[in-house]
A protein has these predicted regions:
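Sec-type signal peptide cleavage vicinity
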Residues: 2-262, 271-282, 287, 320
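Short loop/turn segments at secondary-structure transitions that flank enzyme active sites
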Residues: 22, 74-76, 120-124, 184, ...
Length: 530
């Protein structure tokens, strides 16, 4: 067995920097040989503490403590991976252009291939590049330079089995320097971003970071003519797609990435706000909440019925940067239970309570709450706070109201189906005889002015034992019902949109097909509307 202690001279290749225009990834020119390696340190050499750095200009140096992995074939024809001794200050030449690594090899086979992988952490146990290390990154220049800035040399052992005296490391990765901008590209929002996910069609990179104003550095595999998708998370969620771009190894790409808002606001029993990140047009989709079921059976089969689905309303609306939206997402109506207190709870934001059952009979499901969006703090819907004022024949929206998606009605026993929320008029509820013609769902002119849905009627001994479903929030009917139809499914509310300034308003009864509580989705549309 022969142990060799060999010092090798290794040179780094260069990462050339070139600026790109917003969202552009552009080709780079070949490196200038005069700038193959430039020294970059964070402290004086006299301190004997040398920190390797990849600078914003894309220049690389060696640092004390670094190692390379050496992969070779031994005389038994086995592949062997070893790591060099850690660099000392004396091993690094002035300027950081070269470094001497001491490597111990056992029985190397002469005139066979040898590979250097730099840094050693980028080599797996079998001596292959550990590219999976790129999948999750920290986004800082320091962490990338120390752990992920993968370079490689492939050569041949001498006829005596010695390492080549000199080697030139070739960079294997592209490095992207991302600055995250708002949709119009006029405001830097990098300081709000805590997570960036990049997909190039084949590979996925996830960058988790503490939000700060520094650019986000990402080491990436070279690709040719690839399509990229980006998602960023911070105060809000953003997305972007970029088509047909190339990343070349050994290049640094400064990229200003203008990203578009794509934010979902889920239900809370409280007012929520969103600050508009860029001036322009946005699509708002509001989903009303589902009504509760008059059943303990999740399927709502037989004599029991699930609540009606909430409505879906959408509009395209223009906002200015910094403007605040006030968002109220309706709560799902509560499911009924047995007994005198068995009516389902009213869904938050205007749903009606389900009627109680008589004695041990089951109650009606609670009505689903409405969902609405406004540019002023108009509050959530209650019995004392409606979204509209004035007469029923000509109601006036409160200042700032943009969009309402009504809630669905609560279900009732004996196959009394609930009405779906939404549409120009809310869906009918049916009674125990299957008759829905005696009264319809709420409409803009025949309703409670965007107010709370009516509570369901409780059962009694003379007419029916089961409670009725609560009405959905929104423009819910307040018409009286005949006593003979006291057990009925709750009516769905109707929806509304501000069409004087808003564009492309649409509403669909029961459009919240996934059911559950209300929500709002706000996405960037563009700087103009056709």
């Amino acid at each position: 067995m022969k142990n060799l202690y060999i010092s090798i001279l290794v040179l780094t290749a260069v990462l050339m920097a070139a600026c790109s225009s917003d969202d552009e990834i552009v080709s780079k020119q070949p490196a200038n040989n005069d700038n193959v390696v430039t020294q970059t340190t964070t402290v004086d050499f006299e301190d004997a503490v040398i920190t390797r750095a990849l600078t914003d200009a894309g220049l690389k140096t060696f640092a004390v403590g670094e190692k390379i992995a050496v992969v070779y074939t031994n005389t038994s024809n086995a592949t062997v991976k070893v790591e060099s001794a850690a660099l000392t200050a004396a091993d690094i030449t002035p300027g950081g252009k070269t470094a001497k690594f001491k490597v111990t090899m056992t029985d190397p086979k002469a005139s066979t291939s040898v590979t250097y992988i730099y840094p050693a952490a980028m080599a797996d146990a079998n001596g292959s590049p550990k590219l999976t290390a790129l999948d999750t990154q920290g986004g800082t220049l320091a962490s990338l330079a120390s752990n992920l800035d993968y370079a490689q040399f492939t050569g041949t052992l001498t006829s005596e089995g010695a390492l080549p005296e000199t080697a030139l490391l070739a960079n294997q990765l592209a490095v992207c320097k991302f600055t995250i901008m708002n949709s119009t590209g006029d405001t830097d929002i990098t300081n709000t971003i805590t997570k960036l996910t990049i997909i190039d069609g084949t590979n996925t990179y996830t960058i988790n970071r503490i939000a700060d104003a520094n650019p986000i550095f990402v080491a990436m595999r070279p690709v040719n003519n690839a399509n990229f998708s980006f998602t960023a998370t911070g105060n809000y969620n953003y997305e972007k797609t970029v088509s047909s771009k190339t990343l070349a190894a050994s290049d640094l790409y400064p990229i200003n990435l203008a990203m578009n808002l794509n934010q979902t606001i889920s239900h809370k029993e409280a007012e929520q706000t969103l600050t508009i990140p860029a001036t322009g047009w946005y699509t708002i989709q509001a989903y009303g909440a589902e009504g509760g079921a008059s059943t303990t059976n999740a399927g709502g089969t037989g004599n029991s019925k699930l609540g009606g689905k909430g409505g879906l309303s959408s509009i395209v609306y223009q906002f200015t940067q910094g403007q605040t939206l006030y968002i109220y997402c309706g709560g799902k109506g509560g499911n009924a239970s047995l007994g005198t207190n068995g009516g389902g709870a009213a869904g938050w934001n205007g749903g009606g309570k389900g009627g109680d059952g008589y004695n041990s009979s089951i109650g009606g499901g609670g009505g689903g709450g409405a969902t609405h969006v406004a540019t002023s703090q108009i509050g959530n819907i209650t019995n004392s706070n409606s979204l509209f004022t004035g007469e029923a024949s000509s109601p006036t929206a409160k200042s700032g109201l943009i969009l309402v998606a009504a809630g669905g009605g609560g279900g009732a026993y004996k196959s009394c189906a609930a009405g779906a929320g939404g549409g120009a008029s809310g869906g009918h509820g049916t009674n125990a005889q299957g008759n829905d013609s005696y009264s319809g769902g709420g409409t803009l002119s025949t309703g409670s002015h965007g107010g709370a849905g009516r509570d369901g009627t409780s059962g009694n001994a003379s007419l029916t034992y089961s409670g009725s479903g609560g009405h959905g929030g929104g423009f819910t009917t307040v018409a009286s019902l005949s006593d003979q139809y006291q057990s009925y499914g709750g009516f769905g509310g109707s929806s509304w949109g501000e069409t004087t300034n808003g564009k492309s308003y649409a509403t669909t009864a029961g459009g919240a097909t996934d059911g559950g509580p209300g929500k709002v989705i706000i996405t960037w549309y563009g700087t103009s509307h056709p």
